[in-house]
Regions:
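Nucleotide-sugar donor-binding/catalytic module of glycosyltransferases
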Residues: 1-242
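C-terminal subregions of glycosyltransferases and related glycan-biosynthesis enzymes
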Residues: 120, 222-400
Length: 400
């Protein structure tokens, strides 16, 4: 049996996807596979590349259907085709180290009940997605061990950290989930692996609720890439954010809407943010499945204020404040509106100009390193972190 399936859902980003596939194919060994779920308008580029240029039996293509699928449906069919004992999902402009298979095997020996593995991720902007100076970052921590599901639940469901994004890296997106856990999730939640239009954060919710043992590594095994065509690129431009949301809404069908009266914040306004998108997903899950939201109202008000701090211009700041204020005024009859008190706008002194180590991450100016893809950046970043072979063999590194 294949030990790890890497699912690669993609839509209309064939050039990036082909580079990602080529990088994964460089890894040796028959114990992993890659399932490419193509949801593109033109099926030819990926079909031709996989059949005639790559011709690697470890890579399987699911061609586009008769009509465009919502993202959640494309993810669903990718998992339905997975054969691996463990499953991971990455984006078509990301990278994951296939040697993760050996790490999984080691964790299965060290932690008998493990059914979910998470790790810190490197982040990287493709060369075409740098409208302003950008920093890539490399987590430099070395610890590994069990994660408390109670603590993770507080961070994700109640937003206990009061930051613009919960620091929860658990889930099938840039994580590895045992097949048995995914089947348990499917049985518990309506006979599907995924329901919500934001399947990555939905997966985090469900894994935290259903996992028996989550092991977290501070050492990264993957790269979150952001190309110019990605949803992640929207974080660098409010205009792009609005365009991405409009396209997403247009192509999303199904019973679950991104707008809900129970949490009346709109993602269609100019001030929408990743922060709000995550909150829409986590609040939906908690309200749908009866998970406690005690403390969420006040905590999210602080998280929203933190999001407003990350504004490059006065216009961006005002749009975010207006978006959040409108939602807080309507939510629970304005119960939490008094807690949303954003500080006045302060323009950033510099934008991604300073490299160095902070918060256990090495920040590097991307214009200076020459890496053209996430895979190349991963190989660059490995010079600053524990060697993979040492982790696999359990040998000590960086000893005093």
């Amino acid at each position: 049996m294949v030990h790890l399936t890497i699912c690669l859902p993609t839509r209309n980003r064939q050039a990036y996807c082909i580079k990602t596939i080529a990088a994964l194919a460089e890894a040796e060994g028959p114990d992993f596979e890659v399932v490419v779920a193509d949801n593109s308008d033109d099926p030819a580029p990926l079909a031709d590349y996989l059949a005639n240029q790559l011709a690697d039996p470890r890579f399987r293509l699911i061609p586009p259907g008769d009509s465009v699928l919502p993202m959640v449906a494309n993810w669903e069919r990718a998992l339905e085709h997975a054969r691996g004992r463990w499953i991971a999902v990455i984006g078509d402009d990301d990278y994951i180290d296939p040697r993760l298979v050996a790490i999984i095997r080691r964790y299965e020996v060290l932690y008998r009940d493990v059914d979910a593995i998470s790790w810190e991720c490197m982040s990287y902007n493709w060369p075409d997605n740098r409208p302003v100076p950008t920093l890539a970052n490399i987590p430099v921590g070395q610890g590994t061990g069990p994660n408390s599901t109670e603590a993770l639940a507080n961070q994700l469901f109640r937003w206990s950290e009061r930051k613009r994004r919960p620091s929860v890296g658990v889930g099938i997106y840039h994580g590895a989930i045992k097949r048995s856990l995914m089947e348990r999730i499917k049985e518990a939640y309506g006979g599907r692996y995924f329901e919500h239009p934001n399947p990555d954060w939905e997966s985090s919710c469900k894994v935290i609720m259903q996992a028996r043992l989550i092991i977290h590594s501070q050492r990264p095994f993957s790269v979150l890439g952001a190309c110019a065509a990605s949803n992640s690129a929207a974080t660098l431009s409010p205009k792009v954010m609005k365009q991405r949301i409009e396209t997403f809404e247009k192509e999303t069908t199904g019973p679950i809407s991104l707008y809900r009266p129970e949490f009346p914040f709109s993602l269609k306004t100019g001030g929408a943010s990743i922060c709000l998108s995550i909150a829409v997903t986590t609040s939906w899950f908690c309200q749908t499945y009866g998970v406690s939201l005690d403390g969420f109202g006040v905590n999210f008000a602080h998280a929203a204020m933190d999001e407003c701090v990350f504004s490059a211009t006065q216009d961006e700041y005002e749009a975010k404040v207006a978006c959040f204020q409108s939602g807080f005024d309507q939510w629970d009859d304005g119960r939490w509106a008094g807690h949303f008190k954003p500080a006045p706008f302060k323009p950033p002194r510099t934008i991604n100009q300073i490299s160095g180590v902070g918060d256990d991450r090495l920040n590097v100016r991307e214009a200076d390193i020459g890496a053209a893809t996430p895979a190349e950046f991963y190989r660059f970043g490995e010079h600053a972190i524990a060697p993979m072979d040492s982790l696999i063999n359990g040998t000590q590194v960086f000893a005093l």
